[in-house]
């Protein structure tokens, strides 16, 4: 499904929170949306592998990487895993790498920046926790919609036809 965050903001202005414009699109899908699963991890993506092995249909993995752009939390291998398991998208408050490969995958990926250095894989982090960045507080179960214009969040799914 294609989402237009500008149109959604016009319709649901009182019901959505708008994330500050910190993110760029790195995935092959320009718009995406779904129910979020939150993760908090810093320069370590081991936990992301565990989560992305699950069925992601209708879901978006939202990762608070502390805004670090020193190590990429998502690379082509991890994004392929997410695509294979039907995740709608990834929002990374941190960095990604192998961007040419990411652009070829049918998944939405929004992140702050790209850097060639990969993350540790020790599995240090937490999932299903409250995270805050970009002026918005996120909870697992909230609904996120993203496109090249921005990212918005709603507690409940928006009625989109």
From Swiss-Prot:
CDD domains: RraA_family (cd16841). It comes from the Bacteria. Its main location: cytoplasm. InterPro entries: RraA (IPR010203), RraA/RraA-like (IPR005493), RraA/RraA-like_sf (IPR036704), RraA_gpbac (IPR014339). It is found in: Cytoplasm. GO terms for molecular function: endoribonuclease inhibitor activity; enzyme binding. Keywords: Cytoplasm. Signal peptide: none annotated. One of its GO terms (cellular component) is cytosol. The keyword Metal-binding does not apply. One of its GO terms (biological process) is negative regulation of RNA catabolic process. PANTHER family: 4-HYDROXY-4-METHYL-2-OXOGLUTARATE ALDOLASE 3-RELATED, REGULATOR OF RIBONUCLEASE ACTIVITY A. Homotrimer. Binds to both RNA-binding sites in the C-terminal region of Rne and to RhlB. Globally modulates RNA abundance by binding to RNase E (Rne) and regulating its endonucleolytic activity. Can modulate Rne action in a substrate-dependent manner by altering the composition of the degradosome. Modulates RNA-binding and helicase activities of the degradosome. Belongs to the RraA family. This is Regulator of ribonuclease activity A. It comes from Salmonella choleraesuis (strain SC-B67).
């Amino acid at each position: 499904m294609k989402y237009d965050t500008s149109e959604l903001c016009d319709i649901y202005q009182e019901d959505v929170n708008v994330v500050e414009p910190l993110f760029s699109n790195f995935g092959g899908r320009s718009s995406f949306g779904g129910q979020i699963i939150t993760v908090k991890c810093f320069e370590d993506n081991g936990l992301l592998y565990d989560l992305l092995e699950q069925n992601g249909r209708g879901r978006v993995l939202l990762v608070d990487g502390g805004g670090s752009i020193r190590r990429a939390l998502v690379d082509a291998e991890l994004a392929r895993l997410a695509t294979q398991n039907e995740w709608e998208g990834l929002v990374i408050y941190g960095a990604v790498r192998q961007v040419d490969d990411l652009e070829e995958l049918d998944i939405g990926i929004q992140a702050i920046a790209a850097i060639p250095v990969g993350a540790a894989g020790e599995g240090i982090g937490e999932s299903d926790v409250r995270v805050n960045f970009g002026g918005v507080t996120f909870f697992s179960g909230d609904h996120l919609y993203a496109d090249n214009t921005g990212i918005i969040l709603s507690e409940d799914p928006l009625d989109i036809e």
